[in-house]
């Protein structure tokens, strides 16, 4: 007949059913679930119950650790549900599907809510249209590789999907704020608005370089596609987000995204990709200015494919091509030499039918 703390709940062994006497002043039971006395709060669900779980209608809150170590594979929320307390679905290693219902508007509350931490079988989720906010660390440390959002979502808080497996995401036009490190590791972001949500640079970039990861992130908007360096110093990412939020700065800032890369190679490769996919005079001028450095980089790496791709941009002068040919000869880069010879036959020095 005493109050049960969160720590006590987290340490409970698997139970197939929970029952209490009616005289208990704090709790009640229904369908084997431990509830608050008024039946509005789900305190503990029997973790030994497997398969599909339908949380009883009328429940408004699920407390911390309510489903810890649950054997459930699918969980369906009632439309009455409004609050998910931190860590309520921790370590649900068999959980594969969550249906959030039509009632809840905020997924996770408070600092570091970590709702689904280490749910290693949860690969895909859909956030329903009525949800406005996804809380801090809500899906931190999950196996999620695909998430679907709907219009109506306005905020995604810090670390919401950190340490997940998501590589591509589409963000609704209604999204106004996206917290830091909420989507690190992205390869591609599709925006349904030409205005980037505030915080996007801190949300998707990192200040720690990882091997075998692309240098840049593709951001597709309705009117244009841009490329942002994957690796940006944190202070520079904050500055970038501030500038992207100011309408009079935004267009020019997007043309200069490559310049925020934390290392010269990152800047150069992001600029090259930008010139290939969405050229503009700003990036063209920049690449001409640093072309000697770029050529030296590819020579040092013995990267003939990369160097030829750079030459194909058509921004090098005839003299620069001659100098590159000589350096390629010195380094034994025969494929580059052959390409330059073919390219120089074109009077414009840009278009060539030569293929590798």
Show where each model-derived region lies.
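Structural signature of tandem-repeat unit edges
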Residues: 1-61, 69-83, 93-108, 118-133, ...
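Ankyrin repeat A-helix N-terminal signature
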Residues: 297-302, 327-333
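Ankyrin repeat structural motif
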Residues: 304-311, 334-341
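Long, compositionally biased eukaryotic scaffolding/regulatory segments
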Residues: 341, 352-356
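Terminal, non-catalytic domain-edge segments
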Residues: 346-350
